[in-house]
């Protein structure tokens, strides 16, 4: 094998190894952050097999049902505080802004923001779940036993 061909082969091998390592690291990083959101139980007790808890200061999404009677609004500002739960612990969500029209106590929401204490999320965005019919099977299993108020029946006077 002549020296020029040997040099080319060496460069091709280095390039293939480099691309493989970069792809592997990228896939590993993506697999660690693929969760759509944490439930309040996962936030408090940890998530996954190793029960890994998120760190204070971490940006995340937390989803659950708004606890009835927990919504507190500041009369002077647009600041709102409320609690969400799934089947266990409650997580406090602090939000500055106008809440979505579908936001109600007993309604499912997803809040995106920064964890400022182990059970307190300062939300930058609050999304109200609008389709109460579909729920992923894992979440449906966790949410069994939680009272859910259907806003359609409350408006008609049937849910009271």
Curated annotation (Swiss-Prot):
NCBIfam families: PRK13165.1, PRK13254.1-1, PRK13254.1-3, PRK13254.1-5. Keywords: Cell inner membrane, Cell membrane, Cytochrome c-type biogenesis, Heme, Iron, Membrane, Metal-binding, Signal-anchor, Transmembrane, Transmembrane helix. SUPFAM superfamilies: Heme chaperone CcmE (SSF82093). One of its GO terms (biological process) is cytochrome complex assembly. This is Cytochrome c-type biogenesis protein CcmE. It comes from the Bacteria. It holds the Pfam family CcmE. Residues 1-8 are cytoplasmic. The chain crosses the membrane at residues 9-29. Belongs to the CcmE/CycJ family. Residues 30-160 are periplasmic. Its main location: membrane. It is found in: Cell inner membrane. It is a single-pass type II membrane protein. Heme binds at residues 130, 134. GO terms for molecular function: heme binding; metal ion binding. GO terms for cellular component: plasma membrane. Heme chaperone required for the biogenesis of c-type cytochromes. Transiently binds heme delivered by CcmC and transfers the heme to apo-cytochromes in a process facilitated by CcmF and CcmH.
């Amino acid at each position: 094998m002549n020296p020029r061909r040997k040099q080319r082969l060496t460069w091709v091998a280095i390039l293939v190894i480099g691309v493989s390592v970069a792809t592997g690291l990228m896939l590993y990083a993506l697999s660690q952050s693929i969760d759509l959101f944490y439930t309040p139980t996962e936030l408090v007790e940890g998530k996954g097999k190793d029960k890994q808890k998120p760190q204070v200061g971490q940006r995340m999404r937390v989803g659950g049902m708004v606890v009835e009677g927990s919504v507190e609004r500041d009369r002077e500002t647009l600041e709102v505080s409320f609690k969400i739960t799934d089947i266990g612990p409650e997580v406090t969500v602090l939000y500055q802004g106008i809440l979505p029209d579908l936001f109600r106590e007993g309604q499912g929401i997803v809040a995106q923001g920064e964890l400022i204490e182990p059970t307190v999320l300062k939300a930058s965005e609050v999304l109200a779940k609008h389709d109460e019919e579909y729920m992923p099977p894992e979440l449906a299993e966790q949410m069994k036993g939680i009272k859910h108020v259907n806003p359609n029946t409350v408006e008609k006077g049937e849910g009271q």
